[in-house]
Amino acid sequence: MAIGEQQVIVIGAGVSGLTSAICLAEAGWPVRVWAAALPQQTTSAVAGAVWGPRPKEPVAKVRGWIEQSLHVFRDLAKDPATGVRMTPALSVGDRIETGAMPPGLELIPDVRPADPADVPGGFRAGFHATLPMIDMPQYLDCLTQRLAATGCEIETRPLRSLAEAAEAAPIVINCAGLGARELAGDATVWPRFGQHVVLTNPGLEQLFIERTGGSEWICYFAHPQRVVCGGISIPGRWDPTPEPEITERILQRCRRIQPRLAEAAVIETITGLRPDRPSVRVEAEPIGRALCIHNYGHGGDGVTLSWGCAREVVNLVGGG
């Protein structure tokens, strides 16, 4: 299709929708964003967040997408206003102890085994690396401003079906996240409830992640003004109401690993529903006379996959 001749509607204003809209608009496509929720009200806004590779289908494509995203985040980290910082990280956990290191870590030049003295009690091994950490409220504002600079505005417009957008534009990008379950009729999309506790930062500069196959783990993301602590994942739970018992467990675990967090005051408890799916879906599908490009099913890896998947969207639109 000829760039500039076809109107594009992007559905969704989370990190996937904004990034896709930016890539399309900066490539010359006229873009509109329709969203049920504005960026700061999306699940993306309550993410930790860090670029961190994890096993995910389709493996070969995901490997390329996370690598593309890493390159972009490294560039963004050169400007503090983006909310992206290259941050020292310590990761520990049973997946490391068994040697099953996450694919993609070879992309990090300074990844190295942690000295046993650096590994908290209860864990046998870990690794150090410098990873892109993203302060999501600040980052979403940055993306929104970058999108606005292209002349694109975000319209609050909930949809009942993709056909509504297909009637308004010949190209539709479905970045609806969990909403894709209804909009795309995809019963394989399910929520995974997550809860974070946000604390004041007592002077921490490192992020910590426990890698485990369990439903609860230890993590904290030390942003300049706050520390986001987690984590938990409850599959199939639709209720976003925070639970005080979960808050207490998160605080106890994180303060055991990092005693300085005992000095920090609780600012708020935040929750979100991660849009889980057996595999990430980035592919084209005709809807009536329109071309629909799906970009959803990222689960808890929306940030890590965002730029790679968005560039794939641009390629699919251009090849449509």
Swiss-Prot record:
InterPro entries: DAO (IPR023209), FAD-dep_OxRdtase (IPR006076). Induction: Repressed in hypoxic conditions. It catalyses: a D-alpha-amino acid + O2 + H2O = a 2-oxocarboxylate + H2O2 + NH4(+). FAD binds at A13, G14, V15, T42, T43, S44, G48, A49, R274, G299, G300, G302, T304. Pfam families: DAO. D-serine binds at Y220, R274, G300. This is D-amino-acid oxidase. It comes from Mycobacterium tuberculosis (strain ATCC 25177 / H37Ra). The gene is dao.
